[in-house]
Each structure stands twice: as structure tokens, then as C-alpha cells.
Amino acid sequence: MQLQTTYPNNNYPIIVEHNAFEELSEYIQDYDKVFLIIDEYVDFNFKTKFMPFLESTHIYKIIVPAGEKMKSFEHYQQTLEHLLEYNLTRNTCLVAIGGGATGDFTGFLASSLLRGVDFIQVPTTILAHDSSVGGKVGINSIHGKNLIGAFYRPKAVIYDLNFLATLPYDEILSGYAEVYKHALLTGQVAVDDIEKHFSTKEKLQSLNDIDQFIFKGIKAKLNVIIKDEKEHNMRKYLNLGHTFGHAVEYKTKIPHGHAVMIGIIYQFIVANTLLDTQFDISYYANYLKKLHYPVQIVQQLNFDDMYHYMLTDKKNNGEGIQMVLLEELGKPRVCHVEKTILIKAFNDLQLVLK
């Protein structure tokens, strides 16, 4: 499957298929220098896949740590200075090969290197099907997640589904959260469909039919970002589960998707109070437990820490905490939420996720 953004200018292709990595050569052949920025785990599992590229004298490989620990000022500065040792021109391309963190990090490097060089996203996880599309790049701060960054479009997204074959279950769980999120934002039929396909850990672990849900997720996101690239309005809806989820992730260091799933349960609880919805919280909590999400980790949290991190959320305004809530499946809205409601929801969350 190949999609194309439809901005007024600076558009890029999104190639999603098995063996898509073979397309990379076409996109990097005209650059003076190309740097493959590769997640250490991906390099370990697919080293031979990258060797033919390294036979070219203008293509280099840089191995970076896997996961969020890479997205720090220290790694950013070290990698930036290392790249500058190569006497670069603006006809340079960085290729992010790894999960969402690798793409975020590499894209931010590209946005600031020589005031902007090209970069290409080569996502290798389910989670990165979401983060690789849309041009959000950045690193973390001591004050919170993704607080330093930019909107910077890649020249291409090349998503080779063969990379998913080596994913451990923990990584599958993390990625599934974003796929499930897109279903919640789409509506009841989409949720019923995905829950039927992935009703148990064993079914999710098999990844049978995951391709079709990845396609749907990318198409859904593309429809949003074309209309609201800079997150002024409807793109905020893609942050469903992320206000509380980012706080959980930053505090506990559990994978992004695990935290977002907990954040999704939290927003259901908040919505039932604030919007008088009737979501069956126990049903969704049990679904997470069946898939083996580490939901018990909420017992280790305290509200004051979570509130502190939620205050740093980029959706907030002068009125305080802004959360994406579902009025019903497929119908999101951004709501101001009072602290008293957040406290009650936190207590209810700890009860339902025991």
C-alpha cells in the first residue's frame, strides 16, 4: 500500500508493505552523505539487511540506544557533534531505522542540523506506525515527555512489515495501544472488529491480520494531520489517553503504549463523571488484563505526581488540565477537567485496576 500526503507543498510518500525496505535505495541515491541512525536492537536482529548500503562510501551507520532513554539532551548533543565531524552539507539525509523513539530523535536531529536536512522514517515497530506519520519530532525534558521538539516532515515513510516478525510481546503490546486508540476514535464497529481479532494474548501475539489494522490506523491519522498538521484543533484528538498516559510513562518508565492504555481507562472514568457517559469501565479494564498489560502498576502511583506531570501537557491552556474524552466511541472532544474530578478518577482507577 502506498499513500501520499496532500499538503499544498512538501508532500511525502508513505509506503506500507512487506519488503518495503528495498525501496530505500531509490530515495537516498542523490545525497552527498547518508546516515542510517539505527536502534541497537534492530541492528542486532537485521544487521545483514543493512550491509549492502554500507558498501557505498557515502553511507554511514550510527547505532543508538533503543527506547526513550535515547531522547535526552546528552544523546542529542553527542550525536549532533558526531555528525558534524563529517563536514556535512545540506545535501545530507538521516534515515531513522527503529521504533518511535528513534524516529522522534532522528527527526529532531535533522530539523536542527545545519538548520534543517532531510530525513526518512523507516519504522520497525507497531507503535511507530503512528509516530512516523505526521512530522512530530523531539526529545524529552526533565520536566516531561516530548516537551522539546518541532513539526518537521520526513521526505518519505518506508514501513517494511517484515520488521514486525521479531518483536517481543512487550513491544507488540505497546504498539497495539495506538492501533486500538484509532479504533476508539473511529467508532463502535471498529472497536468490535479489533477486539474480535485480538481477544486474547495468544491472538495478539500471533499478529494475524495486524496489517489491516495498521493500514486503517495510518489512513485515519493521515486524514487528521492533513487538516490540522500543527495540532490546533482536531489533531489533539489523537492524544486520546495520552494526558494521563504520558504522566504514567514518565514516572514509571513503562513502555509508551502500556501507559497510554492505562490513560485510556482513566479518560473513560473521567468521561463518565464529567460528560455523564455510561462506559463500562470494568469491561475495558478486563480487556487490558486479558492481554496482560501491567495495569497493577497504578497501585504504585500517587495522584500528586500524576497531577504535576499532567500540568506539563502541551494541550493545556490557562484554564488548566485539558483532556481528550470520548462522548461516545468515535466522538472525541477536548474538555477542561477540574482537579477534584481528576482525583476521584484516579482513586477509581486504582480500584478497577487492582
From Swiss-Prot:
Listed pathway(s): Metabolic intermediate biosynthesis; chorismate biosynthesis; chorismate from D-erythrose 4-phosphate and phosphoenolpyruvate: step 2/7
Pfam families with a match to the protein in the record: DHQ_synthase, DHQS_C
CDD domains for the chain: DHQS
Key word Transcription present: no
Highest taxon, organism lineage: Bacteria
Family annotation (SUPFAM superfamilies): Dehydroquinate synthase-like
EC code(s) of this entry: 4.2.3.4
Chemical reaction(s) catalysed: 7-phospho-2-dehydro-3-deoxy-D-arabino-heptonate = 3-dehydroquinate + phosphate
Keywords: Amino-acid biosynthesis, Aromatic amino acid biosynthesis, Cobalt, Cytoplasm, Lyase, Metal-binding, NAD, Nucleotide-binding, Zinc
Function recorded in the entry: Catalyzes the conversion of 3-deoxy-D-arabino-heptulosonate 7-phosphate (DAHP) to dehydroquinate (DHQ).
Co-factor: note: Binds 1 divalent metal cation per subunit. Can use either Co(2+) or Zn(2+).
InterPro entries in UniProt: Dehydroquinate_synthase, DHQ_synth_AroB, DHQ_synth_fam, DHQS/DOIS_N, DHQS_C
Family stated for the protein in its record: Belongs to the sugar phosphate cyclases superfamily. Dehydroquinate synthase family.
UniProt organism field: Staphylococcus haemolyticus (strain JCSC1435)
GO molecular function annotation: 3-dehydroquinate synthase activity; metal ion binding; nucleotide binding
Cofactor requirements of the protein: Co(2+); Zn(2+); NAD(+)
Location(s) in or outside the cell: Cytoplasm
Residue numbers binding NAD(+): 100-104, 124-125, 136, 145, 163-166
Main location: cytoplasm
Gene Ontology BP annotations: amino acid biosynthetic process; aromatic amino acid family biosynthetic process; chorismate biosynthetic process
NCBIfam families assigned: aroB (TIGR01357)
Cellular component terms per the entry's GO annotation: cytoplasm
Descriptive protein name: 3-dehydroquinate synthase
Binding-site list for Zn(2+): 178, 242, 256
